[in-house]
Regions:
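Asp-based, Mg2+/Mn2+-dependent phosphohydrolase catalytic module
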Residues: 2-4, 67-85, 93-171
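Metal-dependent phosphoesterase signature
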Residues: 13-34, 59-68, 92-100
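Substrate-recognition element of Asp-dependent hydrolases with the DxDx(T/V) motif
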Residues: 36, 40-73, 84-93, 136
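Active-site neighborhood of HAD-like aspartate-dependent phosphohydrolases
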Residues: 1-49
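Generic enzyme active-site microenvironment
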Residues: 9-11, 53, 126
Length: 171
């Protein structure tokens, strides 16, 4: 019998960092949201892999580069004590290119499932958009929506990652 692992999939903008406008790629604008480092530490201590899954369509639109995304991810890792196990991003946008990595498709999730031998039934997605919830549901991952970015009916829905962490750790 093979042992499987559990993970928290995390959308980036609006969950881990403050969302400013349509895209966040400048280091000066990349602000880690309050409570994120502590929440990640609690989840890691509970045995979860921590995996970022983020759409970065600004690359396809030529607004910024993959190098700028990597710089933001390095800043995030530094702020969070390097607790994140993987940071995946899709650089596609439907107006420019197609990709199975782009949420609501589940390609980024599937990469992590294979890499870390994850059991989707033991995993969660925390995101601020319905497409995050759809991507997780496509492979059997439970979702928690945070914030009020989209006016959609989804339960559970909480204020931020701190509140989502409390739900996950009580489950």
């Amino acid at each position: 019998m093979t042992t499987t692992n559990k993970a928290i999939f995390l959308d980036r903008d609006g969950v881990l960092n403050d969302e400013i406008g349509d895209y966040v790629w400048k280091l000066d604008d990349f602000i880690v949201s309050p409570g994120v480092p502590e929440s990640l530490a609690r989840l890691k201590a509970a045995g979860y892999y921590l995996v970022v899954v983020t759409n970065q369509a600004g690359i396809a639109k030529k607004l910024y580069t993959a190098a700028e995304v990597h710089a933001c991810h390095a800043k995030l890792q530094d702020a969070c004590g390097h607790l994140l196990d993987a940071l995946y991003f899709s650089d596609a946008h439907p107006s420019v290119s197609d990709s199975i990595l782009r949420k609501p498709d589940s390609g980024m999730f599937e990469k992590a499932v294979a890499r870390f031998n994850l059991d989707p039934a033991q995993c969660w997605i925390v995101g601020d958009r319905y497409r995050d919830m759809e991507a997780g549901a496509n492979i059997g991952v439970r979702g928690i929506m945070v914030g009020e970015t989209e006016a959609v009916d989804f339960t559970p829905r909480v204020a931020d990652l701190r509140a989502a962490t409390n739900i996950i750790l009580r489950a």
